[in-house]
């Protein structure tokens, strides 16, 4: 259950918005000129300075006493992916998820040259299995895309692959890197991701291909009048498409597509004294609402009194 308690004081600190997350004030009118943004915000505790904090040595197995920050094990405990423990305390729980049997294809823009090493380091840090045979970077055009000079897309890519792996450590993960953050490149990469899941190759799959899995899209842009023309990108049989709802008010595409599971965000609140779980809150910065152009899908008929005749999002939310 998602809870917001206005009587509880917000944790003090500041939020840093990467340049890749800032939406343009005006956007293009075609897929080749319209850009997508990441959905990443960085929380900095009050008084925090980079020189004051160093991560634990990967050789030290979690949990890390006194940190009280979420780990794969603590999040798995909250969502009952493992045997639960009282408080699901990050300082004490150690059971990581063990699921994942199929394929997850993550689509992002630009190259993250440290994606593989970052994932290996992350896995060692939190006691997760890691195999190079189950992680592959795929380039949209077959050649390495440029990097994002702001570093924002690299951050998004590392976060995406790490927590996909954390929650489904036995799944095969593809990171599909688009040439740019133009929608034309991102949607071409979505098609590649769909093919990789359905038949294990980047080109069109043979008739009768039966592969199954998920495509993750942690990006989006403001809605536009012709967006419904492109919802067919998310209809490959056996593939479930997920997209982020965003980190600011309102709706974004492709999250509002009726062919996509729109994922919102929450925050897990913990006792400052013990680290035990208190409640799950919705974000006041989280995206959501009713679409400007997408009609209500049949599967939302039960909430028509809330969304009216339009597609409502998000569908699910989690930390």
Model-derived regions, located:
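N-terminal zymogen propeptides
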Residues: 1-179, 199-210, 214, 240
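Extracellular protease catalytic domains of secreted zymogens
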Residues: 167, 171-319
